[in-house]
Swiss-Prot record:
It comes from Rattus norvegicus. Residues 554-717 form the RUN domain. The gene is Sgsm3. Pfam families: RabGAP-TBC (PF00566), RUN (PF02759), SH3_1 (PF00018). Interacts with GJA1. Interaction with GJA1 induces its degradation. Interacts (via RUN domain) with NF2 (via C-terminus). Interacts with RAB3A, RAB4A, RAB5A, RAB8A, RAB11A, RAP1A, RAP1B, RAP2A, RAP2B and PDCD6I. No interaction with RAB27A. No interaction with GJB1 or GJD2. This is Small G protein signaling modulator 3.
Amino acid sequence: MSGNHTPSASGPFSALTPSIWPQEILAKSSQKEDSSEPEICYDEFGFRVDKEGSEPGCSQMAGTPLVEDPPQRLRWQAHLEFTHNHDVGDLTWDKIAVSLPRSEKLRSLVLAGIPHGMRPQLWMRLSGALQKKKNSELSYREIVKNSSNDETIAAKQIEKDLLRTMPSNACFANVNSIGVPRLRRVLRALAWLYPEIGYCQGTGMVAACLLLFLEEEDAFWMMCAIIEDLLPASYFSTTLLGVQTDQRVLRHLIVQYLPRLDKLLQEHDIELSLITLHWFLTAFASVVHIRLLLRIWDLFFYEGSLVLFQTTLGMLRLKEEELIQSENSASIFNTLSDIPAQMDDAELLLGEAMQLAGSLTDVAVETQRRKHLAYLIADQGQTLGTSTTTSLSQVVRRRTQRRKSGITSLLFGEDDLEALKAKNIKQTELVADLREAILRVARHFQCTDPKNCSVELTPDYSMESHQRDHENYVACLRSHRRRAKALLDFERHDDDELGFRKNDIITIISQKDEHCWVGELNGLRGWFPAKFVEVLDERSKEYSIAGDDSVTEGVTDLVRGTLCPALKALFEHGLKKPSLLGGACHPWLFIEEAAGREVERDFDSVYSRLVLCKTYRLDEDGKVLTPEELLYRAVQSVNVTHDAAHAQMDVKLRSLICVGLNEQVLHLWLEVLCSSLPTVEKWYQPWSFLRSPGWVQIKCELRVLCCFAFSLSQDWELPAKREEEKQPLKEGVQDMLVKHHLFSWDIDG
């Protein structure tokens, strides 16, 4: 029976926000008849309580219930009344400003602790999260909607970590727990809003703790405040530059505030960051007992990352004597690792932290950060790449501007000057997003396959480059080698056979026989079953595992999850909306029409087809493959395969882009589409990218990608047809065995 079961005062789940109370568990606990099942006990925060203690840092803190101090609550109420209530009547939260004026009085109140019932409202105001929520162009609901379609590496990793984040808490213990879908939405929304960060396990721990005490939307905006304001940039990025820098700053502060401990760490050559990096990355979430965490976070949301240093120094100071008396390095390391779990007195810890490092200022920390960041980048410069340093000053948020409603535009029009500015800004952003997506793909190739490191990533904008595009396209066939990739292992039994392992690249010498080809691998020549390999169409580039989505999964996410959305945004820029409600409006429809129109134009002239036959290469069927016809055939191929699977136009567009990358003609296809002037004018506004000279710049940017060899599956997003795939391979092998009289092989084995 569903109902609104309420926890008892100071009982299990009583400290949580009401919307996350696990009603099933509360219902069971209220029915004492079911005494046959062993009862699982939970504390007021929803953590399992047993003899060993399932929660991090279980200590004497777990034995005392969380009870608000009435005088403390009165002091807070008096402060808020005095500073905010200028009207006669009761003070309510909607009358309190979105941010609290900073003062010494407010700091002393925060240091003494915030009443638990007031934390959700005060945390939002102290951190600046409420201000962000009010000022945001997009609502949390809209961000969640935008992020729900992102199938990227981040989304996959989030799914893997959902049940690992807080398994000992009833709200996140299993798939059906009430907090799991909330955590999923918050983390996916953050990954969408901060594409350079994506997902980091540290954000998952912090978000899960926030969801225990705040509503989902408020927890999201709190995370935004943490990422953008409370912590330095790149704290949660893939490089972890921000948090690594803070570990070096911490070592500097230990030299200053705890010289005896510094000497001990140097003597035993102990790398403190192996322990403390996790403390900083999670802002102590899952590191200390939840009650101590609440007190630390009260200060953290008011003063920012300075509190992380002060708290860590306070912990180390309290255990300094024990560390100095340790006998060996292992003992010191274990003692350091156990420090957070042994912290059971919030007043003692925070008092020690403020007494020791209360004079520490943001200016001092920031000065050290700049210095150590420079050292860190110098040390890791080769692996970080040149673009990393430019993004450390701030966290880059995805542009989130709400579009005017159609009715508003019709009734009141648009501010022409402002609209023009917005369009210019939007164009710049679109090019920047595409450029970043291309660079991410390029860096993937260079990191995965070193032979790509010499590729020039700076686009060539010269006029001559466009003429060379078609010359290079024609020249591809002249340097073309026929090679194939092994689909499975083939063991060599006779001298005339060619053995290979799955994913080996074989040079094809002869394809005269339908079933058995002759090839060369590592200096050896021999025959092999044709069905055991897949012919590579490498154009003028050598095959690279970095571009093969059957070998390297990451390239799929970079292309379909990053590059394709950036290209789609360009094609959507200035796309005319349908005049009738319900009319379709998608770049795919424009591409279909433009590709068909360009091919029809060539079909009108027999002479032009004869010229094209001499100019461009022919495929194995003798068909002319100009860039225009290659585009047309690719569109038709995608339609045939994807319509059968009822795929959406977004999927079709992504698959077409993958084909263009495989053929190394994506930039030429853009030129074909933009040169179809009647179609472009029909589908696009005059200020759109595709009707402006700006498309030439996009073509130059895309040309960089033709330097890399892609082997992407056109049907990657379609349901797999396993039965149909397996049968032809076996039949082909049977034919080959019959032909060569190799009946001694057990083909069913």
